[in-house]
């Protein structure tokens, strides 16, 4: 078949559109091999000005993964495609191995995707049907049932799935016609994994009974996606009224909504923060245990690597971090200090900064600590001594932020909470002063 009459090539060309800088997720399996071959054909035979880079993610889950990496690198060399490989650690504790591998893979994609590139992956129509059925098994709503969009925002660009209208049968036929070689992952035959069970046992029966089943499911997924897009459009203005510059939600305004509308807004809040979608039961717990908790409580509810917190009648979605209250970090001041937990960098600045304090004396050792619990404290700008809790409250510092603000000590004397306050002991009067800048991540 001539390339110009090939439905698969034409579909890739249509979906790629005007994008020319492309990062291809390449596992060496038949799907991604066909996708990459199709893009190479568009570059070489259609003369499209495509700049192709393939990335192989080594999950470390299969003893053959090193051989697969070599296979992919060899193919890219022959096809004159730039090649990247990345080894990742898979965390399967929370969502299982499949989800952990996917999260690690897409994190690698984020790491290497350039601002002018789009990410292209090889999911096809049968994958879409399997994703729909898995979402149905979980009891998902329209958002989950919409499955995988052909195009979606990803980092600063887009993620494209140009094979979603192409069947597995078409892909394999193309591979055989063009004499392509690909990797067969033996784990794909392990029906302990839900997706493999569907592909090996359920989909063949459904397709035998209804040959166009995958196509029909893909159409239903698209309709669910359209409904979600319409809801996004209708609720966007109201969501913007609920959210402030810190991406927190106004509980008082949210409480005026019906439960159905409130849940829809909460889901869109999670999506806006690029977090995994909460379940219906999780949304109920969020509202009852966090939003409606007693006024003097400090409620929290964990969602994977984040947690929802409440402060001053607003909901915040914040990352869970390692406890730092026992850490004491020495700092010479002559070099920038990289803070733990990706909290940023401290540096002595000659230009500007919010924290100006006295310079340490020769016999004073400078350390950085976290978590202030002083019973009595006097700070610049306040006449009377106050407890640290009272000071945090007066400065409107949320409880979870209080243990993440770097505290500057000279020996065992608190000098400043960076970007927040300076103590009387650290006040720069007639003495030599320094300016500390915190470049938060």
Swiss-Prot record:
One GO process term, biological-process aspect: tRNA modification
Listed Pfam families: ATP_bind_3, TilS, TilS_C
A single cellular component GO annotation: cytoplasm
Molecular function GO terms recorded: ATP binding; tRNA(Ile)-lysidine synthase activity
Uppermost EC category: ligase
Signal peptide range in chain numbering: none
UniProt entry keywords in alphabetical sequence: ATP-binding, Cytoplasm, Ligase, Nucleotide-binding, tRNA processing
Listed InterPro entries: Lysidine-tRNA-synth_C, Rossmann-like_a/b/a_fold, TilS/TtcA_N, tRNA_Ile_lys_synt, tRNA_Ile_lys_synt_N, tRNA_Ile_lys_synt_subst-bd
Protein family according to the UniProt entry: Belongs to the tRNA(Ile)-lysidine synthase family.
Biological function: Ligates lysine onto the cytidine present at position 34 of the AUA codon-specific tRNA(Ile) that contains the anticodon CAU, in an ATP-dependent manner. Cytidine is converted to lysidine, thus changing the amino acid specificity of the tRNA from methionine to isoleucine.
Protein name: tRNA(Ile)-lysidine synthase
Gene that specifies this protein: tilS
């Amino acid at each position: 078949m001539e390339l110009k009459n090939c439905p698969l090539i034409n579909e890739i060309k249509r979906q790629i559109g005007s994008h020319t800088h492309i990062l291809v997720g390449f596992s060496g399996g038949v799907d991604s091999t066909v996708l990459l071959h199709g893009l190479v054909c568009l570059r070489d035979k259609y003369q499209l000005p495509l700049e192709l880079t393939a990335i192989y993610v080594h999950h470390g889950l299969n003893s053959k993964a090193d051989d697969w990496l070599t296979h992919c690198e060899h193919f890219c060399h022959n096809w004159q495609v730039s090649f990247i490989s990345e080894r990742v650690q898979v965390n399967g504790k929370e969502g299982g191995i499949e989800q952990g591998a996917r999260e690690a893979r897409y994190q690698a994609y984020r790491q290497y995707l350039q601002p002018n590139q789009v990410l292209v992956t090889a999911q096809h129509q049968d994958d879409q049907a399997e994703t729909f059925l898995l979402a149905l098994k979980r009891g998902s709503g329209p958002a989950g049932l919409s499955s995988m969009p052909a195009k979606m925002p990803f980092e600063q660009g887009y993620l494209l799935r140009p094979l979603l209208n192409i069947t597995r049968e078409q892909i394999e036929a193309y591979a055989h016609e063009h004499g392509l070689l690909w990797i067969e992952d033996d784990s794909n035959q392990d029906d302990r994994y839900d997706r493999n069970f569907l592909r090996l046992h359920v989909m063949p029966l459904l397709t035998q009974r209804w040959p166009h089943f995958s196509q029909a499911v893909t159409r239903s997924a698209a309709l669910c996606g359209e409904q979600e897009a319409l809801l996004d459009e209708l609720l966007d203005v109201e969501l913007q009224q609920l959210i402030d510059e810190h991406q927190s939600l106004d509980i008082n305004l949210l409480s005026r909504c019906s439960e159905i509308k409130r849940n829809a807004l909460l889901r869109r809040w999670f999506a806006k923060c690029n977090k995994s979608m909460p379940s219906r039961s999780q949304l109920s717990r969020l509202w009852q245990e966090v939003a409606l908790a007693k006024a003097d409580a400090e409620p929290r509810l964990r969602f994977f690597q984040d947690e929802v917190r409440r402060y001053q009648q607003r909901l915040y979605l914040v990352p869970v971090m390692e406890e730092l209250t026992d850490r004491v970090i020495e700092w010479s001041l002559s070099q920038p200090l990289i803070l733990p937990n990706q909290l940023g960098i401290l540096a002595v600045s000659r230009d500007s900064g919010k924290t100006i304090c006295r310079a340490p004396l020769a016999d004073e050792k400078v350390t950085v600590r976290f978590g202030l619990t002083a019973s009595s404290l006097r700070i610049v700008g306040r006449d009377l001594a106050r407890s640290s809790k009272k000071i945090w409250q007066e400065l409107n510092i949320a409880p979870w932020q209080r243990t993440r603000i770097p505290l500057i000590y000279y020996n065992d004397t608190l000098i400043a909470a960076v970007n927040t306050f300076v103590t009387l002991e650290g006040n720069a009067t007639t003495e030599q002063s320094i300016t500390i800048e915190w470049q938060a991540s």
